[in-house]
């Protein structure tokens, strides 16, 4: 019994340490975020080792923004629906071989290279998801499987 209690405590501390932040968010990162998203609410930060990710909301839209360790903006992902994407993207998806699959998630991805892409997640079955990335012109850029 005593061994089980000790084992449980060790597991608890291991899980807690994995979820802990490794370092403080640099001021350059938070200042860059505040300058870019002054009206953001519910901001939470994640340390991704080579970058920092802010999860937040603006006008009830769920967003994620990634910054370098020096505070340079890398990309922003905004949750949306297939109905809210440009007509070209909608048409590109409808013409794809995955159009019959149920759409699980849609993200608008804006990058520092001034390109906007749309990531559509479709669920084939309980064990198989496909991540489809479209250009703003509706061309499928990538098609990845997640098991």
Predicted regions and their residues:
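Bacterial Sec-dependent N-terminal signal peptides
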Residues: 1-24, 33
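Interaction-mediating elements
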Residues: 21-147
